């Protein structure tokens, strides 16, 4: 090779590597910056997805212990004694047999390759499949815009195509976000050298994409000039663990409807789970009855729709929405407050409490918890996706705190107002 050609090649390589997006893509390093991804709500399933697998969507699951997806026939595997194999078996899906950490490698019978147990909570099915490494991708961000693409290696589980049943059309797997070492945000934290912390701003149906930020940092929503939402949260409360489940749990001391305390049968703290698997908040039967009755009393003068029309199932309280009136926080109905450990309120206004089920009918969007015989006692409340929409929710594993902005309509913005235009 001539000296001139060698110098030209060296110069090209140096220039390419000096570009931040090129370095990030090659090294899987976002230079210590958080990553951002768009969140889409699927109209058919009410599930939320992020396009982080070659631009294809994975379903967000706050209770999912693993990231799993369909794999190519040829893929790398991890050995059974690898520490990630142990982490993959930290939580066992329901109905899945305990059959060890792996199986003999077909290509090398003397090698034990690790298997995991991906679980589809929407179909209730699980499988046994290889633990592998996969490249995922998102964009580095300054909290205002995406900056440049970042590709990084993640430990994931393969899954048979049959496990994709009941996922949104086009989804290739599930991005587990639970409190485990193999959850998506934990792997982003390790690979990008950022905080083990993430924020979800879930969109409402038909209102554009929401935003997920992995690794902490600010979040600015349009219009320009608005303050950092992550720095102006309405409240925080401690996160608690459940020894049997890897999801996110907080504690409430009481519930109020229309600023009056709801009388419950227990004086014990109320366990509350946050969950993207269900569309609407589910309440334990005793809590459900007390809350629904209190809401009915507080709306006694409003025009009820009885019996509720078929589209309203499984809701109990439905109203003629033309009679409700409106505010910038949604329908003018009594607010519901969860009074949390530490004293802050998670307040549910009409925008998150009332689901529009037909042109002129809106219903109180809470349901009863579905319990199964032999399963652990359910939480008092499971906050579903609808009640988290247009509300920045911050999950901070390092501080073991949960933060929330409250309904962003009150700030005259929404979760669909992040500027996804790539910064120049």
UniProtKB/Swiss-Prot annotation:
- Spell out the InterPro entries in the cross-references: Aspartic_peptidase_A1, PEPTIDASE_A1, Peptidase_aspartic_dom_sf, TAXi_C, TAXi_N, Xylanase_inhibitor_I-like
Query: Which BP terms in the Gene Ontology apply to this protein?
Result: chitin catabolic process; defense response to fungus; polysaccharide catabolic process; proteolysis; root development; shoot system development
Per the entry, what induces it?
Induced by infection with an incompatible race of the fungal pathogen Magnaporthe oryzae.
Instruction: Give the disruption phenotype, in one or two sentences.
Output: Retarded growth of roots and shoots.
According to its UniProt entry, what is the function of this protein? Answer: Chitinase that possesses antifungal activity. Inhibits the growth of the fungal pathogen Rhizoctonia solani by degrading the fungal cell wall. Does not possess inhibiting activity against fungal endo-1,4-beta-D-xylanases belonging to glycoside hydrolase family 10 (GH10) and family 11 (GH11). Involved in the regulation of plant growth by regulating the intracellular calcium ion concentration in roots.
Record family assignment: Belongs to the peptidase A1 family.
- Which reaction is the catalytic activity of this chain? Random endo-hydrolysis of N-acetyl-beta-D-glucosaminide (1->4)-beta-linkages in chitin and chitodextrins
Q: List the disulfide bonds.
A: none
- Its recorded name reads Chitinase CLP
Look up the domain of life of the source.
Answer: Eukaryota
Q: Where this protein primarily resides, as one coarse class? A: secreted
Q: Which Gene3D superfamilies match?
A: Acid Proteases (2.40.70.10)
In Gene Ontology terms, what is one molecular function of this protein?
A: aspartic-type endopeptidase activity
Q: Which residues are glycosylated?
A: 139, 345, 419
EC number per UniProt: 3.2.1.14
Originating species: Oryza sativa subsp. japonica (Rice)
Record-annotated Peptidase A1 domain positions = 43-405
